[in-house]
Amino acid sequence: VIVDNFSNSKPEALNRIKKITGKDFAFYEADLLDLAALEKIFEENKIDAVIHFAGLKAVGESVQKPVEYYHNNITGTLMLIKAMRKYGCKKIVFSSSATVYGPVNKAPYTEDMPTSATNPYGYTKVMIEQILRDVYVSDNDWSVSLLRYFNPIGAHKSGLIGEDPNGIPNNLLPYICQVAVGTVSYTHLTLPTNSRV
């Protein structure tokens, strides 16, 4: 089962996934903020685990729109957890971010380092990680995995899927790739002082 609201993706990706995998799957166009829609999805499907990649993810935009980021990312995750709990689904893999290591910690990073952030996007990841820890502490039948990765890049070897956001990419390498293939035109690029290039 795949759920997406297409806020930063395209429906064509679904057909490409089917082509690559040779499998069909249920798809729901829904938003995590819509608890009724989530409950309908759980009602109609036997879901054992959730891989949670949903959320707004542009650091710069999060500084300009902090309320939208907190509402979408945190409230959306809370709605998802409520639906999961109601339907007895207690396994979740959460797409967090290496941004939770904050500016103080130095590489190489370890999972026992304290978390912090420098922007609303990062704080949503820190807060959601804590929410999921608290869910586990309250009921250790839950299985919670937190993925703290840097900006992943690349595509399937077929070239059918990879990062293809709506609009101009917010990450450097996808932006360079779109300039290289002529999808977007070159503009002078200024990196923030805290960029990890």
Predicted features along the sequence, with ranges:
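Conserved small/polar residues in nucleotide/adenosyl-binding loops
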Residues: 187-193
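Generic alpha-helical structural context detector
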Residues: 82, 151, 174-181
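Generic structural signal for nonpolar/small residues that stabilize regular secondary structure
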Residues: 147-149, 176, 189
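Glycine/proline-rich active-site loop of Rossmann-fold NAD(P)-dependent oxidoreductases
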Residues: 126, 139-142, 154-174, 183
